[in-house]
Each structure stands twice: as C-alpha cells, then as structure tokens.
Amino acid sequence: MKTSLGKAALLALSMMPVTVFASHWSYEGEGSPEHWGALNEEYKTCQNGMNQSPINIDATFKTHLSPLDTHYIDGPITLINNGHTIQAALKTTTADTITIDGTPFILQQFHFHAPSENTVHGKHYAMEMHLVHKNAKGAVAVVAVMFEQGAENTELNKLWATMPEQAEQTAKIVTQMDLNALLPIDKTYWRFSGSLTTPPCSEGVTRIVLKHPLTLSSAQLAKFSHAMHHDNNRPVQPLNGRVVIE
C-alpha cells in the first residue's frame, strides 16, 4: 500500500509543472479547496483521504528524532509562476538531497504558500516554503520552512528578483543562491504522515515542519501576494488519530 501511495504522489509531483496550467482547481470560488474532491475523479482523495495535509500542530509526542540531514549544494535554475504558486525548479542532475531514516531523498522543486498552510497552536505564519523530495522508490518527503513578517530576507531576494508576475511564465534565476540560507540554523522539527496539499492530494507523504521560522519583509510578502492575486493556502485538515512526533 505504501508503495502504491508513493507512486501516486510521485506521479502527481512529476506532472505538476506540465498540467497545472490546464487544471481548473484553484483557491477561490467553485474551484476552491472545499470543492476539490468533486472537481475530478482523480481528486477524490482530497475529499475522502484520512491522512490529509496541512494540519494544525498542537499536541505532540516526544521521541528521539534524528537530526535533519540536508545536503544542498546546487540551488535552483528557474522560477515558475504556475498560477497556484511560485515554484523553483532544479536541474535534473541535482545533488541536492536530504536523508531521512538513512534513506536519501532528492530535491525535486520548492514552492511557497501565503499565508502558511500548516499552523502551530492555531497560528498561521506569513508564508511557508515547501521543499519537495523523492527517494529511489518514489516516496515523497516535504520539508516546510515557516516565515514570519520582519526583517528582509536577503537570500529570498535572489529569487524574488526574477519572479514572474503572470501565470504560465517562467524565468531563469540569474543570481546563484545558497539554499541552505533559506533554512533556520536550528533544524529541529515536527514530523507526521500526510499528503500533497494540492490536487490530487496523494497520501503517503512524509511531512517535516521545521520549528524555527525565518523572516521576510512586508515588501517581499506583498510582491508574492501581487503575483498570486489571492491567498494560496489549503485549510488545515483533521488529524484523524494521527500523531505528530518531535
């Protein structure tokens, strides 16, 4: 079952940049999150799934999680406005990886949501970045980094400088960026089993939410919001008995 779920999530992940422009799901009106499950037979999990993301992180179970092992050296090469988010793509031969439970996961892309999708004790952050990875078996792991409004984020400016302002536009990233600078120094985290937060909402995704937020300025947040024209966060979903560990 886990293998099939992982393959479904991988398929959705690999197809997203190509199909997302034609998709009729959205964050507003008849295509908004509460209607996703009825829009397409392939989206039924958005409505019927029991391990959906995002969630509100409140009660947690303390355990001995291994430190998050990140190995980011390449950085992104293009920035895409797909109408749903701003997404950074990497070269197909990237060496950017994380290691979870001894297994390497290769970074596929990363993108942003404003306000945050996951909440902590009911609190939304100004923005949330999702770093999407997969391993050799097709399993998907997503690392979330929160941003609160405050000081300008210098590294984020390297992305924002080439941000496409219209949907279906792609821009080349001209300034080499250090992806490690978009991670907090303290990489302690919460972990739970979840799903993709966009259709088809495939489950079997390892979700990791870093505890310590970064900052971005009000101007940086406004630029993202202007490009999106709307909030792009799915509401939190029921835990349905799931346990969040830390």
From Swiss-Prot:
Main location: periplasm
Cofactor: Zn(2+)
Alphabetically ordered keywords of this record: Disulfide bond, Lyase, Metal-binding, Periplasm, Signal, Zinc
Cysteine pairs bridged by disulfides in the record: C46-C201
Annotated EC: 4.2.1.1
Stretch forming the signal peptide: 1-22
Reactions listed under catalytic activity: hydrogencarbonate + H(+) = CO2 + H2O
PANTHER family found in the cross-reference section: CARBONIC ANHYDRASE
Protein's UniProt name: Carbonic anhydrase
Species for this entry: Klebsiella pneumoniae
